[in-house]
Amino acid sequence: MDIQLKKGILELVILKFLSSRDYYGYELNKDINEILQLNESTVYALLKKLIEKNLCIQYIKNSDNGPSRKYYQITTLGMQHLKNLEQE
C-alpha cells in the first residue's frame, strides 16, 4: 500500500475517534489497536502532526487515579478535514 495512502487512512481513523470525544493518548492507542494493529509510536507521531496542522489540540487534565494525562481534542478545522477525507 502506498505510504501516503496509509497515512491518510490513519489520519482519518484518528480524527474519527477524536470526533466522538476527547481521548488521552494511551486510551486512543488502545481503542485504535482493537481495529488496526499499529505501533504505539505511530499513533503519537500522527497526533503530533495533527497538532502541527491545527487539526487537533492537546491539553493536560488531572486524573483522580494517578498522574495528569495529556488529552487530545479535534478542532473545528479538524472536523472540516475529516468531512473532506470521508467524502474522498
Where do the protein language model's features map onto the residues?
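A generic structural signal for short beta-strands and their flanking turns/coil linkers
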Residues: 8-11, 52, 68-70
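N-terminal helix-turn-helix DNA-binding core of bacterial DNA-binding proteins
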Residues: 2-44, 61
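Basic, amphipathic "hinge/linker" alpha-helix immediately C-terminal to the N-terminal HTH DNA-binding motif
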Residues: 63-86
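A short, conserved structural fragment
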Residues: 51-59
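Alpha-helical DNA-recognition elements
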Residues: 45, 49
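Short, charged/polar surface micro-motifs in flexible loops or helix N-caps
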Residues: 20-23, 52-53, 77-79
